Amino acid sequence: MSGDENPASKPTPVQDVQGDGRWMSLHHRFVADSKDKEPEVVFIGDSLVQLMHQCEIWRELFSPLHALNFGIGGDSTQHVLWRLENGELEHIRPKIVVVWVGTNNHGHTAEQVTGGIKAIVQLVNERQPQARVVVLGLLPRGQHPNPLREKNRRVNELVRAALAGHPRAHFLDADPGFVHSDGTISHHDMYDYLHLSRLGYTPVCRALHSLLLRLLTQDQGQGGAPLPEPSP
């Protein structure tokens, strides 16, 4: 399926239905931020990326990596593609780009969402060939079992298979076990059964941080710069 046939992999800006221009303002701010920063790691995605920046664990684990957070609430794969094609990768040379997006692609099939994520990986590989890409798996959502959980699970299966053996891309299952044995998700982990609480972010971020350090260490062994020290 080509990008022309798959709306999830066709770069598209968000329609400004509210009329305040916030999405484009954030995009322009991210482009400006990239002009005077030298990040080791760039995060891009939807609200799960955006809200991570407000948690103490971001400052503990990711600020020492000089990480930039380019998350915008509500974004789908096609919106991230548009942002990446329009300047958010132009002025930086990160070692790793973390991608977490897809749960908002409500009108798209699991196969289409997978195509959108693959298009993002391909674009990052083309624009930032030195960088590794880490794709975080979509989380389960909803207090009780529902079709969106199954769709996200299927996306994860497809993306994992698509990236298997990829030399510069890695899939990380971000779910530490949010679904309990009775099929429910606790509001202590996801306060609205979609977005993570501070408690919910902790295991996700620690697993991601471990992977990032491992990848950065591998690159350091190949002649990269020394790693920054984590915060105490």
From Swiss-Prot:
This is Platelet-activating factor acetylhydrolase IB subunit alpha1. Forms a catalytic dimer which is either homodimer (alpha1/alpha1 homodimer) or heterodimer with PAFAH1B2 (alpha1/alpha2 heterodimer). Component of the cytosolic (PAF-AH (I)) heterotetrameric enzyme, which is composed of PAFAH1B1 (beta), PAFAH1B2 (alpha2) and PAFAH1B3 (alpha1) subunits. The catalytic activity of the enzyme resides in the alpha1 (PAFAH1B3) and alpha2 (PAFAH1B2) subunits, whereas the beta subunit (PAFAH1B1) has regulatory activity. Trimer formation is not essential for the catalytic activity. Interacts with VLDLR; this interaction may modulate the Reelin pathway. The modification N-acetylserine is found at S2. InterPro entries: SGNH_hydro (IPR013830), SGNH_hydro_sf (IPR036514). It comes from Bos taurus. GO terms for biological process: lipid catabolic process; spermatogenesis. It catalyses: a 1-O-alkyl-2-acetyl-sn-glycero-3-phosphocholine + H2O = a 1-O-alkyl-sn-glycero-3-phosphocholine + acetate + H(+); 1-O-hexadecyl-2-acetyl-sn-glycero-3-phosphocholine + H2O = 1-O-hexadecyl-sn-glycero-3-phosphocholine + acetate + H(+); 1-O-hexadecyl-2-acetyl-sn-glycero-3-phosphate + H2O = 1-O-hexadecyl-sn-glycero-3-phosphate + acetate + H(+). GO terms for molecular function: 1-alkyl-2-acetylglycerophosphocholine esterase activity; platelet-activating factor acetyltransferase activity; protein heterodimerization activity; protein homodimerization activity. The active site is at S47, D192, H195. Originally the subunits of the type I platelet-activating factor (PAF) acetylhydrolase was named alpha (PAFAH1B1), beta (PAFAH1B2) and gamma (PAFAH1B3). Now these subunits have been renamed beta (PAFAH1B1), alpha2 (PAFAH1B2) and alpha1 (PAFAH1B3) respectively. Pfam families: Lipase_GDSL_2 (PF13472). Its EC number is 3.1.1.47. Keywords: Acetylation, Cytoplasm, Hydrolase, Lipid degradation, Lipid metabolism, Phosphoprotein. It is found in: Cytoplasm. Belongs to the 'GDSL' lipolytic enzyme family. Platelet-activating factor acetylhydrolase IB beta/gamma subunits subfamily. One of its GO terms (cellular component) is cytoplasm. Disulfide bonds: none annotated. Alpha1 catalytic subunit of the cytosolic type I platelet-activating factor (PAF) acetylhydrolase (PAF-AH (I)) heterotetrameric enzyme that catalyzes the hydrolyze of the acetyl group at the sn-2 position of PAF and its analogs and modulates the action of PAF. The activity and substrate specificity of PAF-AH (I) are affected by its subunit composition. Beta subunit (PAFAH1B1) inhibits the acetylhydrolase activity of the alpha1/alpha1 catalytic homodimer. The modification Phosphoserine is found at S2. SUPFAM superfamilies: SGNH hydrolase.
